[in-house]
Every structure is written in C-alpha cells, then in structure tokens.
Amino acid sequence: MQPLVILAIVALVVTLIIAIVVWTIVFIEIRKIRRQRKIDRLIDRIRERAEDSGNESEGDTEELSKLVEMGHDAPWDVDDL
C-alpha cells in the first residue's frame, strides 16, 4: 500500500474515534440538563403549592428526594453550562 492510502485510513479511524467521543459527551450533558430541568420543575411546583396551602406537597417532595438520590446532592448548585 502507498503511504498516502495508509495515512487516509488512519485519518478516517481517528476521525471516527473523535466523533464517537464527542457525541458521547454531548449525550451525557443532555441527560444532565434534562434531569436538572425536571428537578427545577419539581422545586417550582413545591414552592407554588407551599405558597397556596401553607405547606409542602408530600408527593412532590418524595419525587424530588428520589431524583436527588440518583446523583445530584444539591440540585440548585449545578454548574453544567
């Protein structure tokens, strides 16, 4: 094989590896952002219900605690972006 053909094949393989790594990172970040949005919506619902009724909703609080146990210790301190 000619050196140019070998170089082209190596370049394609390296490009493929880089693309896989980049898309994996993008997928992980999208999952983090979606989870954070879900946590933010739950916190907003808890605040609204607390203002309306004077106490927090048990169901929303339990759901929020499940999300926090899945990976976020402090959902209001996430610096993903």
UniProtKB/Swiss-Prot annotation:
Gene Ontology molecular function terms on file: CD4 receptor binding; monoatomic cation channel activity
Keyword Transmembrane helix annotated: yes
Record's comment on post-translational modification: Phosphorylated by host CK2. This phosphorylation is necessary for interaction with human BTRC and degradation of CD4.
Species for this entry: Human immunodeficiency virus type 1 group M subtype A (isolate MAL)
Name of the protein in question: Protein Vpu
Bias (Acidic residues): 53-62
Extracellular-side positions: 1-7
Segments for region (Disordered): 50-81
One Pfam family here: Vpu
Cited function: Enhances virion budding by targeting host CD4 and Tetherin/BST2 to proteasome degradation. Degradation of CD4 prevents any unwanted premature interactions between viral Env and its host receptor CD4 in the endoplasmic reticulum. Degradation of antiretroviral protein Tetherin/BST2 is important for virion budding, as BST2 tethers new viral particles to the host cell membrane. Mechanistically, Vpu bridges either CD4 or BST2 to BTRC, a substrate recognition subunit of the Skp1/Cullin/F-box protein E3 ubiquitin ligase, induces their ubiquitination and subsequent proteasomal degradation.
InterPro entries: Vpu, Vpu_cyt_dom_sf
